[in-house]
Amino acid sequence: MWKLIKGLNHVGVAVSNLDEALKTFKTTLGLEPCYVKEVRDQKIRVASFKVGESTLELFEPTDPSSTVAGFLAKRGEGMHHIALAVDDIRATLDAAQKAGATVIDREPRVGAEGQLIAFLHPKSTRGTLIELCQE
């Protein structure tokens, strides 16, 4: 399956207050977001930063019933997921399932940047939530 992974797409960090986090990342690290927008179907507001060849996403829940709100309640702020770039998300999902991974999204959906995404359950990946992003 490793041949299906192209590289790192981004790292996602869950925050309780995106506006405060934006201030922190600007004053502490000098980072300015490329965009800030709401992703309604995921019930989040997200800010994306280009950091060299990589991307960092900060996101807050917009609904207390969202999975991100649940994550924050259980674990607090911090790294939420690692996103890996793939050419063919469906082939990667099929290979992951055949290898025994539990997929969260049986069908890919559209992510914050308009590309197809799907998640692998952290119980299948040694405690790390993996997002697959078709580039």
Give names to the regions the model predicted.
Residues 20, 38-42:
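Short glycine/proline-centered loop/turn elements that form peptide/ligand docking sites
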Residues 1-4, 47-50, 84, 93-135:
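Vicinal oxygen chelate
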Residues 33-39, 107-111:
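Conserved catalytic-core motifs of GNAT/GCN5-like acyltransferases
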Residues 70-99:
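Short, solvent-exposed interaction modules
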Residues 1-22, 77-86, 135:
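N-terminal beta-strand motif that seeds the catalytic metal site of vicinal oxygen chelate
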Residues 21-26, 96:
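Conserved active-site tyrosine of GNAT-family acetyltransferases
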Residues 34-35, 65-69:
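A short, acidic/glycine-rich surface segment
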